[in-house]
C-alpha cells in the first residue's frame, strides 16, 4: 500500500468532516468543508497525472515507506542511520523518493504554532535528494518518474495528513482542522511551482558545467 490509493483516499475524505465534528466545535470548523473539498480536488488532479504515465509499470524496489526526519539518526550534523522499517514493502521506487523529498524539504515549526509554519519548501533539498539518488543508483530516474514527481509529493502531502486525522480527529497533538488548513496553505504555495520542481530535478546535460 502507498499514498497513491484513490479508492481508499476518497472513502476516508468523504467521512472527514463528520470525524472532525466529533472533536471540534462548529466555530473551530468554520470553512473546513471548503478546505476538505480543495484537498480532494488537488488529490484527484495529482492522482490522474500519476495514472497517465502508467504507475504500475514504473521501476519497483523495496521501499522504506515512512522516510522522514523523525526516522533518521544524526551525528555531528550527518545522517548515520535510517530507522523504523515497519512500513517496508515492494512498491514503485519513486513513491519513496518523492515522499522523502516532501518530508525533508517541508519547512515546519513547533506543533504549538502550526498556524505560523512557513508555506514554502526548500527547493535545493528536493534537487539534492534526486541528484544523490541518481548518483548512487544503477538506474537513474526515468523521464516519466521526473514528470510525476511533484504530483506524488502532492498526493503524499494530502494523504499522509488526512489518514491519521480521520483515525483520531487530530494530527498528533495538533487539532485536525488546524493541520488541514496548514496543508491547504502549503499546497497553494506549491502548486504554482510544480513545473519548476520538474525543471530542477532534471539530470544535467552531458558535459554541462553546473557552475557555468
Sequence positions of predicted segments:
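Active-site acidic catalytic loop and adjacent metal/ATP-binding pocket
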Residues: 47-95, 209-212
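Active-site activation/catalytic loop segments of kinase-like enzymes and analogous catalytic loops
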Residues: 94-138, 154-172
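Surface-exposed helix-capping loop/turn segments at secondary-structure junctions
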Residues: 51-56, 138-144
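An acidic intrinsically disordered interaction segment
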Residues: 59, 64, 68-69, 115-131, ...
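All-alpha amphipathic helical-bundle segments outside canonical DNA-binding/catalytic cores
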Residues: 141-153
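Hydrophobic core segments within long, regular secondary-structure runs in both alpha-
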Residues: 40, 44, 123-130, 184-191
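ATP/Mg2+ or Mg2+-diphosphate-binding catalytic cores
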Residues: 3, 7-10, 14-23, 159-212
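ATP-dependent phospho-/nucleotidyl transfer catalytic cores
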Residues: 1-64, 75
Amino acid at each position: 500500500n502507498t499514498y497513491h490509493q484513490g479508492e481508499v483516499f476518497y472513502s476516508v475524505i468523504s467521512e472527514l468532516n463528520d470525524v472532525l465534528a466529533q472533536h471540534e466545535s462548529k466555530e473551530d470548523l468554520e470553512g473546513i468543508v471548503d478546505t476538505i473539498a480543495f484537498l480532494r480536488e488537488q488529490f484527484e488532479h495529482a492522482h490522474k497525472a500519476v495514472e497517465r504515465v502508467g504507475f504500475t509499470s514504473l521501476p519497483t524496489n523495496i521501499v522504506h515507506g515512512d522516510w522522514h526526519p523523525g526516522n533518521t539518526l544524526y551525528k555531528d550534523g550527518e545522517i548515520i542511520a535510517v530507522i523504523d522499517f515497519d512500513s517496508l514493502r515492494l512498491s514503485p521506487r519513486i513513491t519513496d523518493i518523492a515522499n522523502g523529498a516532501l518530508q525533508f524539504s517541508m519547512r515546519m515549526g513547533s506543533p504549538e504554532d502550526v498556524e505560523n509554519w512557513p508555506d514554502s519548501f526548500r527547493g535545493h533539498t528536493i534537487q539534492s535528494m534526486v541528484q544523490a539518488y541518481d548518483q548512487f543508483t544503477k538506474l537513474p530516474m526515468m523521464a516519466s518518474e521526473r514528470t510525476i514527481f511533484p504530483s506524488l509529493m502532492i498526493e503524499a502531502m494530502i494523504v499522509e495528513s488526512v489518514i491519521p486525522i480521520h483515525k483520531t480527529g487530530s494530527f498528533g497533538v495538533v487539532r485536525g482542522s488546524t493541520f488541514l488548513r496548514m496543508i491547504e496553505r502549503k499546497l497553494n504555495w506549491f502548486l504554482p511551482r510544480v513545473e519548476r520542481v520538474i525543471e530542477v530535478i532534471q539530470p544535467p546535460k552531458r558535459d554541462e558545467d553546473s557552475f557555468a
